[in-house]
Amino acid sequence: MNKSAIRYLSLLLVFLMGGSFLAGITTFGQTSSTAGGVTISVSNEWVGNDTVVLVAIYNPNVPQSAQGAKYVAGNVTISAGGVTVPLISNDTSNASVVYYLNNGQHYFWFFITMTPVPTTSASSLSMTETLTINSTSTNVQLTNPYLSFTTPVGNVQTDGKAGVFQLTLPSSFPNQLIGEYGQTVYGGHKVNITDLYFFSGDKTITISYSTGASVTINNYLADSSNYAATLQTTESTVPLNSTWQVYFVDNIMQANPLVGGNGGFMITANGTQVSPVIQNVSYLAVKNGVYVNTTVFANNPVPNAQAMFGYGNVYYGNFTMYTSSIVTNKTYATLLSGNNYTPANVSFSQYKMLITSGLFTTNTPITIYLSDWIGNNASVSIKGTIKETTLQSITLSVQKGENLTVNDFNNISNYSVRRNIMVYVALQNITGSTYKTAMVSLPETYAGSGVFSLPTVLRIGSSPSITYSTSQVTITLPPYDFSNTSLLITATNDIGASYYYLGSNTVKNISTPGTISVGTPTLVPIPNVVSVANVTPVIELAYTEPNLAFGTATTLTVSGTSVKYNGVQVATDSVTAVLPNGTVISGNLNGLSITSLTSANGNGTFFIVVPSTVIKTFLGTHTYIPSGTELTFKIYDEFAAQTLSVTYKFTTVAPVIAIKTPTSTSFSSAETAYLPPLPYNVVPEKHYISVNVTDTLYAQSVPSSALQTTLKIIVENPAGQKVGNVVTTVVSETAANSGLFTGKIYYTVYENSSGYWLNINGQNITNLKNVVNGGLIVFEYTSPSSQSTVNATALLEPSPFTLSVSQTSANPGQHVNVSVNSPGLVESSNMKFTGSLIIYAQFAEWNGPGSQPTIAVSPITLKEVSAGSPVFGGTIVLGNSSVVSSGNLTSLITTPGYTVAPGSVVLVNANATIGPTSTSSSITPYYQQQSISINVVDINVSILNPSPASPFAKLEIELQSPLFNLLTHPAAGNYTSAGTSAGILEGILSTITTQQSQQLVTSTQLVTSPKTSFYYNNTIWVIETPMTLWSGTPGSYGIPIEVNLTDLLTVTHNVYAIHVVEVPNVTTGTVSLVSAYAVPSVSSNVAQLQINGLVPPVISVFFNGNNITQSASAAIPFPNTTAGELVNVTVYAPDAVNNLNVPGSGTTFNVTIVNTANGETTTLTLTQMTKIIGGVAVPTPYYTGLLKVVEPTVYTPGTPGVISASSGVVNKVLVNMNLVEGQYYNTQGLLQQLRMKASSYFYVGVIKLSVLVSHFTILSNGTPVTGMQVGKSYSLLFNVTNNGNVNETIYGTLEVLLNGTPVQPEIVAQITLAPGQSTQIGTLFTPTMPGSYTITFIPFQNNLLSIPYNQGLTEVVTAS
């Protein structure tokens, strides 16, 4: 080659994961840029001689039209080496070169090249190279038939010369390109090209759009030394004689961006047309190859070309090639005319020679070189290897197939094409002899995998066979061959594997065994019992043959002794019976009327069902099966070559009896029956015992009818002796021939003058003492058919009896659950008693403070909680007369105004007259008692007035207790009298006293005064009574309560202790209540209230949650909307609370608002703030309201709660309070007022002073200029703006200096501006000499020019 050197750029692919590297198409470089919504893209990173590159500009804001194309052309520049030229210029081409792609997507195209202008028109352009290839000098000519140069008529120039380069579009180009002047270009026609040869000496060239988007491409003419083609391979390890794809990226070989295939160049070497790429495959250090011409398989388009160019078929020299693992030389390549070679494909003898001569081994380094025809090349190294051929073992069953697989890496001939190999499959008998062989073609799992496989299945047939298709291999065997057949799989190693792994110079076969998996069959009885009653209606067997489990319903046909599947015999059967006398009867399933067996769900289990009627016919007995008969079923299974057998033996079965008592959960022959704790006379319950008798022999005596029979009920004492009369009862068959007979009896205990009696089905049997503890109820049954007698027993025991309560302490009015647990109260496990169990409670009832408690007794109703439950439960209410008793809810007290006394006790009593300790000597009662302690409930007394309070306020006393809702009370609401609750309130309160005025008011004075009012709500009483200023007269007690101007008021109240007297009962072991009494005492907890009529009010003002009271820095802003600004005014005034002299009894008053800036006045109503404590709204000493501050333009004088603010000044707004607290007589006897006074203020508006000097302008005769000329006059003007929020008078100084020396007197200006207003301040100036003049303007706040707003603005202007 005649370049400076052949540049072998080797791309070494390092494979880390052991598999082939699938590179895919090489990633396209960064050849696109977006800015300002415009994207510019190029098709190639390199441009060179005779090559054309596409440039696309996507601008969605430019219309798709000729005008749009012209607009885009005017916004493109090209720059390199510090020189920038427009896209359309004489240095490039002044022809119309921009076209819009007519696809509706705003793409604009132009094409570029780096080709010198020829001297004349040319229909195509070429270049030549002389290269040394395979030691032979080769003359190469590369022609771009799509590139031409045309000399048009007119002033069209390219690189300063007449004419224009043009590109012929491919004839298959589907779109239209429309140029700047509306010219339309179709496929097969020419477009103009921009030539960049003006920049041929620059390594890089940048194409820019006016929005800032730009792309940079490389110039091959100036920088070919840095150009590098790249090569990537899809494989890292390959066998001998294989081919695969590589990707050769050679940008400079893409002559036409719109042409795939060879890229657009037409190339000849020594006069012979060749493809653009040649390749050399060498075994480095082993055997070198030569370059051979190779056909391009594919030219890959630019990734994402559709998005970049609006068209998908844009190319950049990314060639897909095929290469080979055979060294390319004359020995292993196909010779063509002109001494060219195609990639190697060797014959077997050549293949073997490469192996045996050691040229290709298990580790052969292969290097592949690819080159173009102008000297650019690249290489990649891979590994050639030989691997051992292996076969996978296989196990087949009818249910599960496996893949027949051969791993044959050496047989990969083309990594892009699947191929097949042949293997031999043989069937061998148990001795190892082959009796059937077939050759099977295995396909490759995917191209280049080297794994050859087909699914293989086992089928049942009448004769053995091996067949295959493209989808599977099928091996068919008759059942008798399953257990004695194996497989042998044989494949052929290629010569490489034979040589290196088997040490053979000839091709060797390898084999692996395969297995036929045979499932084990079974024959079992269902259920798994072989000794059965001779009255069993049906027997059933399960024949499980797993080799017939297909997953779908399967049927076997039974004919004679043969069992067949799809006509193929799978088993034989026989049935043999041996009678008790030794007679043998032989037959088969057919003889038992069985013609088929079915596995309904396809799991391989087939059910053999034989009714007893068929068995009787088979035996010849017809009416019965003799006891002792044996029946044997045999099946010979041909899959497993195994005989399966089950033998039944028939026996006679005795009847069975079982009972179920009220408390048992299932039937058995022995149960316990609990006696009721109370006789039927008290609790009318019947207790049922169910009886089940199973007598199949008797049922079969008349199988067509449901029969009845009787059994005896016998009562025995604990010694086993019968007592009383025998009772009979009838049991009935549930259905014809079912053999199950059912019935039931009931038992109770009756009390009469002679004592307690056990009663069965309404008959008194015996005195209860005879059986009370250990007696039996015996159920005796004798079968009418077999005369067998069986019995069941119910053991009689006295019932446990337990009383319980859900809690042992409770509050008055609370609900408490009470229950009795006694199994003797159960009627039946599935019955619920509809009656009640009555027990009793003893307690102390109380009418509240001021009264004494009394002892009372109340019945309690209990109900069975659920069917069959031994628990009878109920709920008692401990003293809430508003609750009505219903069902098992019992309210102990029904008298209104009474409750169970707090601090007392409730006794709950339940008795069992037939107790658990009863014996044959005596029926003993049993007593149960539970105690519930009643909690002491406090009565809380508090004062609701906020402290301190005014002497003129109403006193509010709150009494709180849950007892109030239980005692006498009115409906919730306000009252002027306590009514019937007065005694309770008097009993709670004790006295009201004052420290300074020495008042003493009793509870009776307070509650009965007509000036006192009341509020009641559930658990709360509130008592309100007036206070007034003490006149000074001692001992003047009463209502209103007279207090000093400063005083301390105290409220005391009573508490009550309840005492009950209990007396024990020696007989029952319980206690009884005989009396109760209440003892009052004064509580140590007192409620107090500070009285102070001299507390000054405090006014606070808030804006947006911030306190702005009397704060200049926290003023509210000037209102700038019609809605204005809201200000919260809050006054702390404890002496106004509950004060009758204040409007609304101390809940509201007015304050006066005065704006001192404009003299406006308004009133603002404040409302008392409350807080909820215990459900009661409690007043606070705080009063609040919202004041609205608005602009003067929307203000209406006299509107309450609204005031305006003057703009431009700070508004000081006063808030004044002057309110009468009360009246009093001074020492001279004159009536005087006591007033609450306060005053405060806040500010509206913060003055902002700000002046901005923002711009300097020079005018010459009204026209702006940037410089001055000596002797001419100019207006020097500064822009001044009032950025503050008030009117401002601005003083300013303007100076003009030259070299630091003033050239005219300082000018002082004065101007007044409103907020936001701007003006210009300046002077007329004529420069007298050239130089740089400094012009400065500084704004000041005062006429003394001592307080500047800011540093002003300084400008430097040159005069010439």
Swiss-Prot record:
Q: Which UniProt keywords apply?
A: Cell wall, S-layer, Secreted, Signal
Q: Where in the cell is it found?
A: Secreted, Cell wall, S-layer
Q: Does the keyword Lipoprotein apply?
A: no
Residues of the signal peptide = 1-24
Q: Name one GO cellular component term.
A: extracellular region
What InterPro entries is this protein classified in? SlaA-like
Function noted in UniProt: S-layer large protein. May form the highly ordered outer sheath.
Assembly and binders: The mushroom-shaped unit cells of the Sulfolobales' S-layers may consist of three SlaB subunits and six SlaA subunits.
Q: Which family does it belong to?
A: Belongs to the Sulfolobales SlaA family.
Designated name of the protein: S-layer protein A
**From which organism does this entry originate?**
Metallosphaera sedula (strain ATCC 51363 / DSM 5348 / JCM 9185 / NBRC 15509 / TH2)
